[in-house]
Amino acid sequence: TDWSQTYDRVWLGGEYWANPMEDWRLVDGAAECQSRGPNRNIHSLTHQITNPKGKFSMEVDVTTLESLDRDGGFGFRIGVRSELDEYRSNCFVNRGLIAGIVGRELKLGDQTYALPEAADWQEVGLLLAGQPRGVGVGLRLTTFNLKSREILGEVSSIVPLDSVRGNVSLVSNYGGNGREGGGKIPSGIGSRHRFANWRLSGDAFTVTPEHRFGPLLWSMYSLSDSRSDEGFVMKISALTGPMGEADNKLVELHVKRHGQWDNLGSAKLDPDAWVATFRIPNWDELVDTPYKLIYRERQRDGSIVPDEWNGKVRANPTGRPLRMAALTCQNDYGFPYEPVANNVEQMDPDIALFSGDQIYESHGGFGVIREPAGPAILNYLRKYYQFGWAFRYAMRNQPTIVLPDDHDVFQGNIWGEAG
């Protein structure tokens, strides 16, 4: 992890999922938690421990920003997995093995080590190492002062192989049921922390760069006969995560025609919705047309990191029955609905219809924020991103219609029952 080149913003980057997104910020090259609520965490999307018989290590630099009564501590959580044991689904459970500092103790699963009373642990490093030990995994957690590099404490444990398999995450303020952690945090309790230089290595990890989610999250397009001199009109929307003031605000659209890529221009990202929309009249509806969306992420050192999202604007179907994939009510207990999403791709429909309740109030946990507008928008986007994360590949190659229903506007039964 090198956030040092990333501009300040809400969205942490395509390699991570933050719980909840609205409670995290990149500030001066580190991820800062903005809430004292429990179980605020960051999952690595590209690194999962799948080979517990291998070796691994994780290291992170931590600064305590705020520590009050009932300080929930900070550190790693490993072996995080859901019943589905799928890297996206794993992001929404709090089970796993704790390896961090809670109170004045170094904690590694069931093992603890009392830290010296005089130790300065406002800025510390944490190093977790694992390697095979008999039929289990030997773990060692070390903490040290970041400035002096003085070791403050160390604790070891041998745990079952299965207890380390799954996602790995950083946690600010262990404890409580984070999924239900919405609402106002009581005064005088909790803690906040800042994480930098998260480093992961070892053959216990499977590294999958394809798991990145963003900056371009997904796209949706439509193709419509305008019945005017504009002919067929193609509209396409590209979504990114919430970017910062200094970040690039433009998305480019390129299409492949006659074997050549043509640049059709740029569209500006809406600063609330983080959507860029293109409208292209007089579209040739008779042929399949590959497209790619490009977002060029600016770095502090002046370099540019491009991100591409590819798909196909399919020819308008004629002379046969229309093939439509119709879906509704994606509640997140089945997230990411992988069999359904895969079947839609294999079906290769002419059009996809999502007829409502793409999200529910409970999605991803951490409650609903209705005001003020800034955090409320981020709270909504975070839940909506789960929909796109699940169906992004099922939406990119055919027109997609997405209709809101009651839960999409956080008002169950708004259409009836005295709503």
Predicted regions and their residues:
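Extracellular glycan-recognition surfaces and repeat-rich motifs
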Residues: W3-A31
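Exposed beta-strand face motif in extracellular beta-rich ectodomains
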Residues: F56, Q122, V287-Y291
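Extended, low-complexity, turn-rich repeat/linker tracts enriched in Gly/Pro/Ser/Thr and Asp/Glu
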Residues: T64-R70, P132-V135, E245
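Residues within well-ordered beta-strands of beta-sheet-rich folds
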Residues: K55-T63, E123-A129, R194, R199, ...
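Secretory/extracellular carbohydrate-interaction modules
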Residues: C33-T112
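Carbohydrate-binding surfaces in secreted/extracellular proteins
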Residues: M58-V60, E117-S157
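Divalent metal-dependent phosphoesterase catalytic cores across multiple superfamilies
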Residues: K147-G190, S201, F205-G419
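Beta-strand-rich interaction surfaces with strong enrichment in secreted/lumenal proteins
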Residues: S44-T50, D110-A118, S157-V159, L264-K268, ...
